[in-house]
Amino acid sequence: MRDTEDMAALGQQGRPVDEVIAELTDKRSGDVKWSDGKTFGMVYDGGPSVHEVAEQAARLYLHENALNTQAFPSLRQIQSDVVGWTADLLNGDENTAGFLTSGGTESILCGVLAARKRGLAERNITEPEMVLSESAHAAFHKAADNFGLTVHKAPVRDDYTANVEAMASMVNDNTVLVVGSAPQYPQGVQDDIPSIAALAKSVDANCHVDACMGGFVLPFAERIGRDISPWDFRVDGVTTISADIHKLGYAPKGVSVILHNTKESRKYQTFVFDDWLGGFYASPNMQGTRSGLPMACAWAVMQHLGIDGYIDLTQQTLVNADLMRAGIMAVDGVRVLGEGQFHLVAMAAEPDSGIDMFALGDALLERGWYHDRQTPPDNLHSTVSNTNTGAIDQYLVDLAECVATVGTTDDRSTTYATLE
């Protein structure tokens, strides 16, 4: 094994395959061990057969490039299939259209860009604005920064849902997009999508529903009898929806879907250019070259699981999450934020308990349990999935023991995504 000091420059001589793989294997030793069920988020495990079908699809499409589907027509069909299946799950119709992207952030970027371009083309809006809740994903702020939109951010209600009345006061003639979440990430609660969509429609703005977390949970939760308030294309005024297949769709990273209620809406996220020496250039999203690997993996996983497979995984996920919520509420000194009914759980200290939640996170991490950290208030966030099956009971034992002994920490940093 070479020292890291030797890695500042690429070696003159190549290295044997087994040596390279051995070093990569060693590098992983400090990563979270997600396969033991002790990581809440980041990786979503659909089980051995899902691994197998994804790995075989990955080998078949390791080098294929969706930049030009004339060369790889199978990728055009794969994208069409996956988009169509997802649109059907989200109650689209024959007019619903979309594209695959690399993940939820890119899907959100595409939705915001389409809203901005439509606002300019159809409403002559040159100073576009977006209205959202403070619980909406940070990617909307990234999109606003990239594409030059002004963001109006409304506070959440006491139950952490979007405050639609506050949002209504921010909507004006320059509004091109109003955002709702199904569910929102921080506390896992679902916004009032019909009211948000009506608000957008009142000024002829787009309404984007961020279902990156819920797109492959809510359709199946509804099928097993959960009470799901309206959120998808059945809601009048919903223009675009983002849904991540690489989360609770159990496909490998990174693949997501951006759906539009019409093909006319979809055209606003695309870019076409033919005034250069290289010929016709068109791209449906933020990428140029697009790996066929995640697209093929998504197709394979969805075909392998089918509706029944997703129902089973969703049922187990919700059992895990319900068990975690009930267990947390039974531990003195900690509580669950919001009335989330799905798979996202945010755990905070009871007021006046004196518990330092980030110190609690440190104590749980010492026992192998990994959470994201959020504030305000300081809380530990869990994205529960099938991955955590069989681990929740031990988690609750460890949680109770750690709560009883936890101290304090000076580390107040929160985590969702990092630069390096």
Task: Please tell me what each predicted stretch does.
Residues 1-95:
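N-terminal entrance/gating region of PLP-dependent enzymes' catalytic architecture
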Residues 164-166, 190-202, 214-240:
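Active-site pre-lysine segment of PLP-dependent enzymes
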Residues 383-420:
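PLP-dependent enzyme catalytic core of the Aspartate aminotransferase-like
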Residues 333-397:
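Conserved PLP-binding catalytic core of the aspartate aminotransferase-like
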Residues 223-342, 347-352, 419-420:
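Active-site C-terminal subdomain of aminotransferase-like
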Residues 162-211:
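Active-site phosphate-binding strand-loop segment of PLP-dependent enzymes
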Residues 79, 83-84, 95-123, 140-143:
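Conserved beta-loop-alpha segment that forms the PLP phosphate-binding cup at the N-terminus of a helix
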Residues 120-174:
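PLP-dependent aminotransferase-like
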